[in-house]
């Protein structure tokens, strides 16, 4: 499981012109599930998202988590995080989990984040989304579930 975490001033997802999810200051997280990922990966990734200290404290040091600052989280499913571009000119997505499994795992990440008391908005699974992200910093980090070590 992979999560691309971005610190943002705001984020928003629209599908066919209608807003399906939006947040103020916090994190936009693109989440992809890979072959062989499971519930333990979802829990691990959610714990990292909730507790990574990537927001500044009074001294300007990254010392606070999204939970600490009262930020929100926008989770967007993103199978292209498993795109393999090593051969040819078209990415291969064979390492991405099948859609039903990916949906279950992305929903598990969202559920775990909510258990941590976070306000979580989401995109729409398997839809063509327009994602607006106003990065802050920018701060962008990749987290991989323990099963996805590569």
Swiss-Prot record:
GO cellular component term, pick one: cytoplasm
Entry's family note: Belongs to the DTD family.
Localisation per UniProt entry: Cytoplasm
InterPro entries linked: Daa-tRNA_deacyls_DTD, DTD-like_sf
NCBIfam families (alphabetical): D-aminoacyl-tRNA deacylase
Assembly and interaction partners: Homodimer.
Main localisation: cytoplasm
Domain topic, free-text comment: A Gly-cisPro motif from one monomer fits into the active site of the other monomer to allow specific chiral rejection of L-amino acids.
Alphabetized PANTHER family for the sequence: D-AMINOACYL-TRNA DEACYLASE 1, D-TYROSYL-TRNA TYR DEACYLASE
Reactions performed catalytically: glycyl-tRNA(Ala) + H2O = tRNA(Ala) + glycine + H(+); a D-aminoacyl-tRNA + H2O = a tRNA + a D-alpha-amino acid + H(+)
Keyword RNA-binding applies: yes
Domain of life assignment: Bacteria
Known function: An aminoacyl-tRNA editing enzyme that deacylates mischarged D-aminoacyl-tRNAs. Also deacylates mischarged glycyl-tRNA(Ala), protecting cells against glycine mischarging by AlaRS. Acts via tRNA-based rather than protein-based catalysis; rejects L-amino acids rather than detecting D-amino acids in the active site. By recycling D-aminoacyl-tRNA to D-amino acids and free tRNA molecules, this enzyme counteracts the toxicity associated with the formation of D-aminoacyl-tRNA entities in vivo and helps enforce protein L-homochirality.
Molecular function GO labels: D-tyrosyl-tRNA(Tyr) deacylase activity; Gly-tRNA(Ala) deacylase activity; Ser(Gly)-tRNA(Ala) hydrolase activity; tRNA binding
Keywords: Cytoplasm, Hydrolase, RNA-binding, tRNA-binding
EC number: 3.1.1.96
Motif (Gly-cisPro motif, important for rejection of L-amino acids): 137-138
Single GO BP term: D-amino acid catabolic process
Pfam family, one: Tyr_Deacylase
Protein name, per record: D-aminoacyl-tRNA deacylase
Cytoplasm listed as a keyword: yes
């Amino acid at each position: 499981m992979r999560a691309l975490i971005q610190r943002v001033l705001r984020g928003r997802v629209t599908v066919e012109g209608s807003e399906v999810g939006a947040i103020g200051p916090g994190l936009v997280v693109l989440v992809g599930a890979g072959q062989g990922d499971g519930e333990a990966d979802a829990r691990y990734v959610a714990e990292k998202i909730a507790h990574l200290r990537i927001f500044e404290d009074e001294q300007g040091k990254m010392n606070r988590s999204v939970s600490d600052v009262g930020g929100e989280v926008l989770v967007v499913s993103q199978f292209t995080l498993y795109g393999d571009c090593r051969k040819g000119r078209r990415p291969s997505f064979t390492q991405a989990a099948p859609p039903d499994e990916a949906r279950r795992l992305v929903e598990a990440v969202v559920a775990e984040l909510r258990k941590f008391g976070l306000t979580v908005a989401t995109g729409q699974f398997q839809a063509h989304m327009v994602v607006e992200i106003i990065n802050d910093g920018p701060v962008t980090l990749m987290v991989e579930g323990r099963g996805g070590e590569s």
